[in-house]
Amino acid sequence: MIDSSHVNRGQRPDYLGKEAFVFMNDSLQYYNQHAKEFSDSTRDVEFKEMQERFLVYLKPGARILDFGCGSGRDTKYFLDRGFETDAADGSEELVRIASGYTGIEVRLMYFQDLDEKEAYDGIWACSSILHLAYRELEDVFIKMARALTSHGILYTSFKYGTAEGERNGRYFTDMTEEKMDKLLKDVNSFDILEMWVTSDVRPGRAEEKWLNMILRKK
């Protein structure tokens, strides 16, 4: 079980630089202020193709961490499919909404606070860790690898591109295949099983592209 009892929203953790803390808090503040709107716009989006593309690599009943669960859409899908599922998010309001929607206790935590060891067969980080600065990602990928069991599976996705910075109240690190390849070489913990580009599935946003990947722990 993920322990979030130490989280203090008003205090910068020792491991976070001042600039990174500001970036993260700005994004979390956005989600706290727009939690209902965000949940309503994402909860009913048809995402079965992606979910099943991840689940095919897992055994029935495997243990999954929904890492940055947002509205709880994917957590509920995994639970309904019979998978043991934990969920975590950094936004207090989204944690409240997702807990009510999924019926489980969603944990409040920063991505950087993941400290589980070989606890999960799969980690689902869908459109979540993209809010970290690029320089924060290597450490978080290493922590995700540590949290996975032997040859565990990670799905994650990023907006497609090379930009990094604040957009409309949130911080984004965009990714291309080349940028991700470099990051994964530095991390040296995962093999790439699949990497592909898709269009946004939300109405009116098909022009937005996403880089998706399924990785296996070495």
Regions flagged by a language model, labelled:
Residues 189-200:
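Conserved S-adenosyl-L-methionine
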Residues 163-179, 202-204:
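Acceptor-substrate binding/catalytic loop of class I
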Residues 71-113:
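Class I SAM-dependent methyltransferase SAM/SAH-binding core
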Residues 112-123:
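A short acidic, Gly/Pro-enriched loop at the edge of an enzyme's catalytic core
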Residues 138-150:
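A short glycine-rich, Lys/Arg-flanked "PGG" loop and its adjoining helix->strand segment in the class I
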Residues 151-158:
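Conserved beta-strand signature within the Rossmann-like core of class I S-adenosyl-L-methionine
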Residues 19-59, 61-70:
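Conserved class I S-adenosyl-L-methionine
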